[in-house]
Amino acid sequence: MGNLPEFSIRDLVEAGVHLGHKAGRWNPAMAPYIYGVHKYKDIHVIDLRKTLVLLRDALSVLYDVVLKRGRVLFVGTKVQASNIVAEEATRCGQYYVNHRWLGGMLTNWETVSSSIRRLVEFERLINNNEGQFTKKELLMLDKQRGKLERSLGGIREMGGLPHALFVIDTNKEHIAIREANKLKIPVVAILDTNSDPGGVDYPIPGNDDSVRSIDFFCRAVSRTILEAIRSDLASSGVNIAAKGSDVAESYAGTAADAGHTPVSETLSAGGPTAGASPYIPEVGPSVVEVDTHKSAALPDSRPNDADVPAEDGVLPDPGVADGAALE
């Protein structure tokens, strides 16, 4: 395996990954991944020791998918994630849904493919118009094209079902996860303290609301995918330096030259059973005692907990026992 991106606990803290929701909004199934409850803010603090291990495991899975020339679909339709998901998926030559998940996008792929062909046809008609359409007709065509582009633009070149999903916010994207489970497509997802872990094969506990945290995770995934592409190109004898700096674009030109074993069945068989919940809801988080005078300030505040002032918060060190302060 090639070199996966390296991260430390401090990197996660600086990205605000540790910040959970208000304690009253938690999902008990997330208890194993919660360090405790902040003494003054009444928000859950995610155990970054577990996040670090599970992040590496998830990145290893995505690396293997891409190394076998599989497709990864980024899914994040919430406002905070939309632009980041599109940018990072595009940067690593993968696919995304960032506007709205259409029911049946995976389970009814033939119909979706037909809609993609309509999108291409609309673009052809608009671009090659030689006076056969009036301005009003062109506006109507462009409106239909725009609607299809928002929903399908990120998967128009996918050419088939993805081999893995990377999901931001499992509560919002539950339909996508359910469809992936039906088709035994592995799901990698960011799980916040209010998330439902059911159906997620490779969970990554973390803040799924902060732009900074979402950007951190998406960049980690895109960097991993690019590393897998570099490794595949190198093993195929491709001179990466000669191809230029755009590794993803270079890869697209060589991906169809050699056949690889499909990875969807392989990964699904090797991962946890879809829909299973290997979590311990009976275990609840304890209150973390911290000293606000000795501890470092929380680097970020949650957009949905705006009433909690970030400058008053402190973070317990995930690397030491409960009750210790981050010096």
Swiss-Prot record:
Biological processes annotated in GO: translation
Keywords, in A-Z order: Ribonucleoprotein, Ribosomal protein
GO molecular function term, any single one: structural constituent of ribosome
Alphabetical list of InterPro entries matching this protein: Ribosomal_uS2, Ribosomal_uS2_bac/mit/plastid, Ribosomal_uS2_CS, Ribosomal_uS2_flav_dom_sf
GO cellular component annotations of the record: cytosolic small ribosomal subunit
Region annotation Disordered: where it falls in the sequence: 258-327
Keyword Transmembrane helix (UniProt): no
CDD domains: RPS2 (cd01425)
Family annotation (HAMAP family): Ribosomal_uS2_B (MF_00291_B)
Family membership noted in the UniProt record: Belongs to the universal ribosomal protein uS2 family.
Name the record gives this protein: Small ribosomal subunit protein uS2
The organism of origin for this protein: Anaplasma marginale (strain St. Maries)
Phylogenetic placement of the source organism: Bacteria, Pseudomonadati, Pseudomonadota, Alphaproteobacteria, Rickettsiales
Gene: rpsB
